[in-house]
Regions:
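Surface-exposed, active-site-proximal loop segments in enzymatic domains
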Residues: 112-126
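N-terminal binding-site loop/beta-alpha segment at the start of enzyme catalytic domains
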Residues: 1-105, 111-114
Length: 127
């Protein structure tokens, strides 16, 4: 199993939408073939309803020709990255390979796990 997007995988993904996606929808960048649109995971309350919504939206986006997903550990208290993971599992069962999908993330943030603690300073100093 691939641990990330590859040229071969993203090319295969784009080929699935040949004749369906508009001309120029897919383009080469960073030695990958990426969709001109992506889906982000930044906004929303940290709750189960939003989690389910994000997971479903990511699955729908990938099935519709979007292979760029933006997320980060600090989005919705780590929940968005977990939603991306849940969506990737669903997509794998639908025949989409990890090597077909570009996941963009960020590093260097300290963030609570799941929700905002009552005392953030204490949380970070004790964790």
């Amino acid at each position: 199993m691939s641990h990330g997007a590859t040229k071969e995988g993203t090319t295969k993904y784009a080929a699935k939408f040949r004749g369906v996606a508009g001309e120029g929808h897919f383009r080469e960048a960073q030695d990958l073939v990426v969709s001109s649109l992506g889906i982000g995971t930044y906004l929303g309350q940290p709750n189960e309803d939003k989690d389910a919504g994000y997971t479903a939206a990511i699955v729908a986006a990938v099935q519709a020709g979007i292979n760029v997903i933006d997320t980060a550990i600090n989005y919705r208290f780590q929940r968005s990255e977990r939603n991306v993971g849940a969506a990737m599992k669903v997509l794998a069962n639908k025949g989409f390979g990890r090597e077909e999908i570009v996941v963009c993330t960020k590093g260097g943030y300290l963030t609570p796990d799941g929700s905002m603690p009552t005392d953030p300073n204490r949380y970070f100093f004790e964790e």
